[in-house]
């Protein structure tokens, strides 16, 4: 995460017109499961104009984001040219992979609930 607006601007300028890799790790711990994994997405930004970066940075959104941007924010919507991988991985939680890991436990719980008689 950037420490100030100047650093946020520099970070966004550095990825402008380039592809960068986002790696999001997660851990699931509990009875019957101990999993540590990660997912990868490649994000390509078009060449951003300085005024677009300044507009986004001045909104304050860049300061609380890893990489100084949120894929769901203005700069992500208008600046990302290509995404290879999961949108949610870039947001910070690879939902699909987490769901697949938890699915057996969800099904187990569902079967318990469905077998309960009122």
Specify the residue positions occupied by each region the protein language model found.
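Anionic-ligand binding patches
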Residues: 1-118
């Amino acid at each position: 995460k950037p420490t100030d607006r100047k650093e946020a601007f520099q970070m966004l300028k550095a990825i402008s017109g380039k592809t960068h890799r986002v790696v999001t790790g997660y851990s699931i711990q509990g009875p019957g499961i101990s999993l540590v994994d990660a997912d990868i997405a490649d994000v390509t930004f078009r060449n951003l104009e300085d005024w677009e970066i300044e507009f986004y940075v001045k909104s304050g959104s860049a300061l609380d984001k890893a990489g100084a941007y949120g894929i769901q924010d203005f700069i992500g919507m208008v600046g990302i040219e290509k995404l290879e991988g999961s949108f949610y991985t870039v947001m910070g939680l690879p939902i699909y992979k987490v769901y697949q890991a938890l699915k057996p436990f969800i099904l187990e719980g569902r079967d318990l609930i469905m077998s309960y008689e009122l």
